[in-house]
Amino acid sequence: RFKCDWSSDVCSSDLDGSWEGVWRDQIINMRQLTPDSIEVTGTDDRKGISRYLGADDDLEYIISNISNRDPYVAKLAENCPGMRILRQDHWECLATYLLATNANVARIGQMVESVCTHYGKDLGGLHAFPTPKQILDGADTIGECRLGFREQRFVTLADRVESGDLDVESFSDMSYEECFKELQGINGVGPKVADCVALFAFEHMDAFPIDARISKVMENRYGVTGSYKNVSAYGRKMFGEFAGYAQEFLYHADFIMF
């Protein structure tokens, strides 16, 4: 939910960029000053924003770990030294990925923006992602958000979280396998969404999400084909505890080449 003003002098630079968005009910502006430093305005919670950005990750150790397993990924990591995995809000990440099923990026953005505008706290120009209670309180107007077949799933998820039937905060304490299984028990969550949420919200760095792009990479680069379960398991076995980072390097490289 962060956007860059590409018309600004800062964003036209190859070195740095200024991004504005919402984090924890605050409007945040971030600008990369140098390859190793970021200027953040809009919050005093330096520890929190650092954790959100994955700035505390030991990249040297992580990259060494996955590079020892595959020289190709080692090269990709060299070309993208600052890539990190976000620690997104549990509820927001899960709810957003539920909306993302069978939709392109533009459509996903429209749905998330609509939900935030209709139900989220107005922060002055931007809106926070709504809480489960805010969604339930306005559930009678959910049709205005134009979520399509995702509408009832979205409201049901909010109800389960708000009632305590689904304790999403406990998912970080589970093993990857337990988390993956529990997530797939949610209506509308398949294996790809479960892996994405496990990785980006619940810090299971051994998750290895498979979408069409990664599926193509795994086939062309490693000769791995078959079911989602088979390809994902291969990636997790090959790259180990930081398979999620390896997946991001592979995805980024293919995206750039595409």
Which residue ranges define each predicted feature?
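A residue-level signal for beta-strand positions that form part of recognition/binding surfaces
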Residues: 9, 18, 37
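Alpha-helical ds-nucleic-acid-binding substructure associated with the helix-hairpin-helix region
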Residues: 46, 50-185, 238
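Single conserved hydrophobic/aromatic residue that forms the stacking wall/gate
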Residues: 2-11
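C-terminal accessory module of base-excision DNA glycosylases/AP lyases that mediates lesion recognition
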Residues: 1, 15-27, 125-258
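Short helix-coil boundary/hinge micro-motifs
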Residues: 22-29, 34-48
